[in-house]
Design a protein with these regions (language model features):
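Cytosolic juxtamembrane amphipathic/interface segments immediately preceding
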Residues: 24, 220-236
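Generic recognition of stable, solvent-exposed alpha-helical segments in well-folded globular domains
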Residues: 106, 205, 209, 228, ...
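Short flexible coil/turn linkers enriched for glycine and charged/polar residues
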Residues: 59, 87, 152, 227, ...
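Conserved C-terminal guanine-recognition region of P-loop GTPase G domains, centered on the G4
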Residues: 2, 6-94
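Structural motif corresponding to the C-terminal cap of alpha-helices
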Residues: 15-18, 217-221, 237
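Hydrophobic alpha-helical segments of integral membrane proteins
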Residues: 89, 206, 210-213, 229-237, ...
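Alpha-helical transmembrane helix bundles of large polytopic membrane transport and channel proteins
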Residues: 64-65, 74-223
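Core alpha-helical transmembrane segments of integral membrane proteins
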Residues: 236-267
C-alpha cells in the first residue's frame, strides 16, 4: 500500500487522473509531481541498486543517479565506469562521496539541467523472448482511451498489468470492464510461452539485466593503494563538526609556532 502511494505521487503529484479520483486517501495539499528523480546508489553494492534504476526508468521522469561511496568501492577493488553507466541508462551519473561533500555541486547541477531539459531515461526493455510474449497485451494497452485514463507511460502500465498488480487491474476492471477478458487472455497466452509464471519471469529478467549491466560498467581489480593518513585528514577536516575543531587546532598550532619563533629571534 505504501509503495503504491509513493508511485502515485511520483506519477501524478496532486493531479490524479479520473481513475484515481475515488481513492480514499486523496492529496490534502497542493504539490506537483517531481520535475526530476534523484537516485542515490551504493557503488559498493551497485548490482542490487541497478534493479531499482531499471524500474525508475519506466516512470517517464527525468532521472539523475548519484554514484555514492566511490572511495570505498575503489578500496574494495571495485572500479565503476560512470560514463559507461550514463550512456547505457541514458541519464546523468555523478560520482560522489557524500560524507565528504565531494561531487555534490556537480550532482545538483546535473539535477537542475535534467529538470530543465526534461530528458527521460532510455527505455530499458525486457529481454526479447518476454517482449515477444507481451506483444498482444501491449497492443491492447495501446488504445488511446486507456492511455488517456491512466496517464502513465505505456511500458509502466504494461509491466504493472503483466505482473498482475492489484490496483491497476482493479481500476481497469472498473473503467474498462470489456477489456479485462482480453487482458486476462493475453496474460495467459504470454505465460504459456514462458518457462515460469509471468511475474517470476519478469523479476528474474530484471535481475539478469541488472547483473549484465553491472558487469558491463564495472571492473574488479586490486584495491586502491590509498595513503591512510591522507584519508584520515580528509575525514577530519571535512567532517561537519570535527572539521571546525580540527581547523581551530591547526590555527592555534600555527599561532603558537609563530610566537615561539618570534621569541627565539627576539632573544
Amino acid at each position: 500500500e505504501a509503495d503504491r502511494q509513493v508511485l502515485m505521487v511520483l506519477l501524478w503529484g496532486d493531479r490524479w487522473p479520473e481513475i484515481a479520483r475515488h481513492e480514499p486517501q486523496q492529496p490534502t495539499s497542493p504539490f506537483r509531481a517531481p520535475d526530476v528523480l534523484l537516485q542515490v546508489v551504493d557503488a559498493t553494492a551497485l548490482e542490487r541498486d541497478l534493479e531499482l534504476s531499471l524500474e525508475l526508468s519506466l516512470l517517464g521522469r527525468p532521472l539523475v543517479i548519484a554514484l555514492n561511496r566511490m572511495d570505498e568501492a575503489r578500496e574494495k577493488g571495485i572500479y565503476v565506469n560512470a560514463r559507461a553507466l550514463s550512456e547505457r541508462l541514458g541519464v546523468p551519473v555523478v560520482a560522489t562521496v557524500a560524507h565528504m561533500g565531494m561531487g555534490l555541486t556537480d550532482l545538483f547541477a546535473a539535477a537542475l539541467a535534467a529538470a530543465r531539459e526534461q530528458a527521460c531515461p532510455l527505455a530499458q526493455q525486457c529481454s526479447e523472448h518476454i517482449r515477444e510474449s507481451l506483444k498482444p497485451l501491449n497492443a491492447i494497452l495501446a488504445r488511446p482511451e486507456i492511455e488517456e485514463a491512466f496517464r502513465v507511460p505505456r511500458p509502466l502500465l504494461l509491466m504493472q498489468l503483466a505482473e498482475n498488480d492489484d490496483w491497476f487491474l482493479r481500476e481497469l476492471a472498473e473503467h474498462f470492464p470489456a477489456v479485462v477478458p482480453e487482458v486476462t487472455a493475453a496474460r495467459a497466452e504470454a505465460q504459456r510461452t514462458l518457462p515460469r509464471p509471468l511475474s517470476d519471469e519478469l523479476h528474474a529478467d530484471r535481475h539478469h539485466r541488472a547483473a549484465l549491466l553491472y558487469e558491463t560498467v564495472t571492473r574488479l581489480g586490486a584495491p586502491e593503494d590509498t595513503e591512510r593518513w591522507k584519508r584520515w585528514l580528509d575525514e577530519l577536516f571535512l567532517h561537519p563538526r570535527g572539521g571546525l575543531i580540527g581547523s581551530l587546532a591547526v590555527f592555534a598550532l600555527v599561532l603558537f609556532m609563530v610566537f615561539e619563533v618570534s621569541a627565539v629571534l627576539d632573544g
